Amino acid sequence: MRSYKPYIIKLCIVFLCFWGWILTSYAQKVGANDYFYVLNTQQGLSDNCILQMMQLADGRLAVRTPKGINLYDGRRFSLIPLPAEKAESITKYKGQTHLYADSQDRLWVKEYQKIFCILLAEGRLLEHPLDDLPGNGKEDKMKMMRNGPARNAIQDLFVDSRKNVWVVMGDSLLNTQDGNQIHLKKEWGCLQDLDTDGKQVYAFMDSGIVAVFQKDKLAYTTSAYSAAEAQHYRNTSLTVQTPSGQFYQIRTGRDEKNKTDASIFLHFNPETRKYSRIFACDYILHTLNMSSDNQALISCQHGYLMFDFKLGTTPREVKELALPDGKSLTTGINTVYRDKEGAIWLGTYHDGLIY
């Protein structure tokens, strides 16, 4: 009797080879164990220039492109346009694109001296959002500051890790949820980042100083470096708090003496009240994502950097990515994000999303 086993085995091999070819045409290898896929305008993204992204509480990915906010649910994109004329002015913010999600299910899109607000539940842009602040019965304090002798306008806005909205008005920092008001001293410089651990409020200034408050009282200040070195890193700041309460920060600026860009990656430990330097370079670091106290991802002009602090502070540099069409991407990675499932997302200037 004729055996069909050899033919079945051959068919299985052909079948597996076929599907292997199909899958590898979409998944490309980045490093030893890294594979990625590409999402761009062909998959419904409004445009291929990614300015910033973050994962929302419901699992969706919010992606800022020049045309607006693209919300990705794992299957398709939906676009919420952000017309320039609908932006509100925040004169003290001079950084890059930053996304915040607050406790009222609003997404704040902060850019150089302007801000947008999206009502996520309704999927629409909220007009004049600063006029609606604050909520929870705190209008009197806000009105007093706006209508008082100084007639302070809202000049900047932050959302902390507890999803509270804070606004800067003159030399005051106001929590719009509970009315806590903090005085910022002029000699500290300009506020660039803010966060809280539930007990203390941390105000990160462009001078490298962090001012720490309990309620509205100053607890202490400390600095990341000397006043002379601070001149190199005044331009931008991005601070991330880990679940254990540690702070990691990238700062950028310009080294005028050497005529180069300047960036530094820092760790601030609230328990010791001290800063430590992790990494410095003569090019611009873009975005920072921390998956734990032991691992960090930073996007930069040359690709992205992967830090594993268990192995030291020297990063693994990923400078070249092989795209599905056979081309290589060597520059143009603007932002990096690790989602709740551990997947790494890369936002590029010209090639959409890579994950």
Regions found by a protein language model. Give the residues of each.
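Carboxylate-rich, polar loop motifs that coordinate divalent cations or form catalytic acidic clusters
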Residues: 1-355
